[in-house]
């Protein structure tokens, strides 16, 4: 079972990445959460795989992630996509990735590097080293959308699950884990402080792009 990452923890992870001069990773974490990406899919992304409003040939107010080597390629489409609806995620993508060349990678490393960074981040936040893993971004994003009222059928499309029955079981378990999860007081305090940092950063970023 992949422990779903709650939104407050996502924010904490993003602040850690920003504070260590890894802005691209902070955006990648937000994108993985919002678009229900698998860790391997995140690490293989290049700039050409993310379409953003204002890009040449792209005439839409939303963005899109194109996944060229999906896990479910044998039973579904060989090239898949997820639409980026979230305004702040789009803003972050524009700010950090807008001027990258088409074949520039969006991840600072491979999946092992991402897993290692997660272990460091967990300890830095006052959690157990392996309490949450990169796979928890997909689980957390799906659970967050489900609790916000997103129909299971929509989640299946966005998350590209092969079977509806599998997704229903997955979301049911994730929601239960998230509801019963408790974090030590030190982690809760740090996440509260980091939330304030991220709110200020996003407010400043939003103002600069208006």
Which sequence ranges carry the predicted segments?
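Extended, non-catalytic subsegments within catalytic or DNA/protein-binding/adaptor domains
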Residues: 1-210
């Amino acid at each position: 079972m992949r422990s779903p990452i709650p939104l407050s923890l996502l924010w904490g992870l993003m602040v850690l990445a920003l504070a260590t001069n890894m802005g691209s990773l902070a955006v990648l974490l937000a994108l993985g959460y919002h678009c229900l990406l698998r860790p391997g899919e995140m690490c293989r992304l290049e700039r050409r795989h993310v379409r953003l409003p204002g890009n040449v040939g792209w005439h839409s107010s939303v963005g899109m992630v194109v996944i060229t080597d999906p896990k479910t390629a044998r039973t579904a489409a060989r090239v898949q996509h997820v639409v980026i609806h979230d305004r702040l995620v789009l803003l972050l993508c524009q700010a950090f990735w807008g001027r990258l060349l088409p074949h520039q990678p969006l991840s600072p490393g491979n999946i092992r590097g991402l897993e290692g960074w997660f272990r460091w981040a967990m300890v830095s936040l006052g959690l157990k080293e392996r309490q949450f893993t990169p796979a928890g971004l997909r689980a957390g994003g799906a659970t967050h959308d489900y609790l916000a009222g997103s129909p299971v059928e929509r989640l299946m499309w966005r998350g590209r699950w092969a079977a509806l029955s599998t997704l229903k079981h997955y979301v049911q378990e994730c929601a239960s884990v998230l509801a019963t999860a408790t974090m030590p007081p030190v982690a809760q305090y740090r996440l509260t402080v980091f939330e304030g940092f991220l709110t200020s950063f996003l407010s400043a970023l939003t103002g600069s792009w208006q």
